[in-house]
């Protein structure tokens, strides 16, 4: 289970206004659920565009300083400047503990890294089991860490002494200094210069997906270049045979969703189509229906990505409930990524082990709150317009693929 990003808070970004909105305790699969136009894609957009390969270490260098996409003019919340856009990253206390212990061992001053000193230092910064590290999005800059943003006027002597001990771990040849000017800010800076706040590549899968023609570059996850990429892992060179494992894994998933143990993908030499061997027939993938076409694309994108953060817009499009559940099971069990998903599917809310966040629009601003209890998830369903009476009080039920199909049923 890979968890690269543990928590994120945003201020003045898109639909999120000056009231800071936070989501924390991320897991492998994280769901942002809400009705249309509630702003549920704001977190995904920020992760994909602004946190791609983020590293605190790169803030002070010319290498890696620029995010994937600079803030656009319409990214700041209405009436606010780009400089007002802030983001906070959640850093678990245990990661800070690890950094301090490793540094003490390296500098042979482990006696300073007593459990009590480490506890007092981190508790002074922490909100529960984590520390929020705040940055400005434009220009990219460090702003503050933890509770020091509260401008506390009094600090207990034992905290001051513990902080000095931690400072001496990072600055073994230094003496003197003060708590406010040296020991605390320099200790925080040294912790953040470690790898504890470095994120991998982030990938964005849009809601509109379509397998592109041959010869296109596989540069994004819209479907362009997918045929050529699958052909590459179907028959890799002798030095890259390990890539075929991914192709076999996608085939196993195809067999799971079709219920046919013989189902197999094939990319022909002309690369005009993705073909499927199934039930002693050879068919283009598109002939199996939009749902199978869609879910195989998603599985391929997420299998090809390795140890990355993947943001997916509305994966439920064209998928009936069983396929939605199978997709979530596949992502959790067979891939190595962390997922952030914007959805309005009630089916996905019940994904085992997923962190769910309820996104709604209140007084014109996007609000985000956790939904971990049955009552909180019920409120999501109510907000989405789901009602038990929609099914219970119906005389009969006819399933259709979309609203446009209703025109065929007017005389039924």
What are these regions (language model features)?
Residues 209, 230-234, 278-280:
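Short, histidine-centered active-site or binding-site loop motifs used for metal coordination
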Residues 1-59, 249-391, 395-397, 406-411:
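Switch/communication elements of ASCE P-loop NTPase nucleotide-binding domains
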Residues 210, 404-405:
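Short, glycine-/Ser/Thr-/acidic-enriched flexible segments
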Residues 192, 237-241, 339:
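Generic amphipathic alpha-helical segments used as scaffolds and interaction surfaces in large
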Residues 219-236:
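A solvent-exposed, charged loop/short amphipathic helix patch at secondary-structure junctions
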Residues 1-216, 245-246, 252-268:
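P-loop NTPase switch/coupling surface
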Residues 231-252:
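Alpha-helical coupling/stalk and coiled-coil linker elements that connect catalytic or binding modules
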